[in-house]
């Protein structure tokens, strides 16, 4: 028997589009006196409703007319699922019975695609205009500057709502592509979605207390393995869950069990955080609090980011205040993908609420072969054969910054306003590509697969808490001048290029309570992909809107760009970050973090100005020497134009100046002004200066003016 009511025919909705206007829906949830669809009421968001309310919506849906599913088709596709969930999901039963603590906020594809990344502002600024006559190019039924766009995500070719699909599963690919399959199988990509019973790190006990916590486990309070479809994540950073209705777990249950529908459903307290549970112990929190008095010390200090358990954060939620009601089709599946072998949507709906049935019909889970190569890949009958998707689908999440669009650079090229998707004050997970987009490396053609093997993305044990990707090309393969200097230094001889140029900066958890970007911590578990270090005493990588508080709760933080439009790293993140998951920190005595460093106290850096002073001790002598050598070479070059020397002496002068010029070229190509190897760089420049002085002495002692 069907447990859901079918949606009113879509054609009827098109005719009645104006009737579902966001301002006419009755609800108790209001904002500025207006109803807010989906906030405490069983309605989809106004972003989706606006799509449906457009009188010309049928002109924008390509699937029926062209056989191709485009952005708005994906958004409309979710309607029937939401009808089912509004009628059947436990959230609404708890709410109806007064056993819900916190307000649910519906989040659908309309919100995620059209609102995420401030895509609305992008749509407004993106004017499709014919340059010859000034008229708008009409390839959609929207007015110029109003056409919906998605900036935060790239759509996958197929969704969990597409039935039937042609997915065959990674094991089928592995029958012929053994090397690629084995590499993938041991990577974290293969572990992003796991069923209960697939967790060796806790002996398959999802309620086992983790690390030194009293009772904090992978699954939150009131959530049992038999009530979920899968967990999301690995021991590297965090664990979340997807419930039996394929809805993101943004809640926990107090004094009861979700599977029984007992107790009280509470917003947040839903995501296990390894960094908090294992490293950020009460003792470490107290240590940080001494230096940063506003750092959370007690459970209540974590505010809406925290919960009732040490190590269990609130993600996609504000503890006891509000939480997203968000199906996996709206969010999770974009990057933490899975697919079913159901042949019809009726089979799919009949299985919702029954996790065992959903698991039985799962044909693919994790970032599998077919997510990039297409369903069925190159096989006869498949729809792949090329690369329907790539890394950037999940790793190039942008955020549109309107202020940047209004700059001269943004007026010339609108993509200048494409900034990095943020989680509060830190770059979000999945922004490696959007960080790289604003870099000289990207402009030169570097892409993810330049350095990474997409099949083997994890180096070492996937159960480790350290972020260490597998690399197929090292920085020094291209940066030979830097390699030459770095191999001759003792200062950072055990460090890699990434130690300074790719600090852990990104947030997976949006753990706002522990984000202190000016102190380069502490919710930073993903490596940055900016590379360029800005040696400046004041300029910061991460900034709120001008004139606003630098508190992490301030809205609108962005990644700074330099005069060339490139992102850059400030000295605090480069030298003194604090990160328990950054192997370049943990394997090198904590670098210069005042909270992790094992170096002498004088090398524990507390602020950017202090670091700048230390760097200047390296760079100033190098720059001074460089200037002397360059000036000497220029003087000799001019003298040789007017001075005649014996052949043997001229040869000697030219050989000496060539050797000095080689040093100049090396230092210029290196570009660090001694930071990569201060003693060695200064030693080479000392030698170059000697060459110049010797050449000058030869001219002074043997030459005469050719014009005399």
From Swiss-Prot:
Keywords from UniProt, A to Z, are: Copper, Electron transport, Heme, Iron, Metal-binding, Oxidoreductase, Periplasm, Signal, Sulfate respiration, Transport
List, separated by semicolons, the cofactors it needs: Cu(+); heme c
The record's function comment reads:
Respiratory sulfite reductase that catalyzes the reduction of sulfite to sulfide in a single step, consuming six electrons in the process. Required for sulfite respiration under anaerobic growth conditions. Does not contribute to nitrite reduction.
Positions of heme c 3 binding: 369, 372-373, 455
Which residues are recorded as binding heme c 6?
A: 441, 475, 478-479
Annotated positions binding heme c 2: 332, 335-336
In terms of superkingdom, the source organism counts as: Bacteria
Gene, per the UniProt record: sirA
Instruction: Kindly report, in one word, the top-level EC class recorded for this enzyme.
Output: oxidoreductase
Write down what this protein is called: Dissimilatory sulfite reductase SirA
Which residues participate in heme c 7 binding?
497, 500-501, 676
Subunit comment for this entry?
Homotrimer.
Coarse class of the protein's main subcellular location: periplasm
User: Which family does the entry's similarity section mention?
Assistant: Belongs to the multiheme cytochrome c family.
Name the GO terms of the biological process aspect.
anaerobic respiration; hydrogen sulfide biosynthetic process
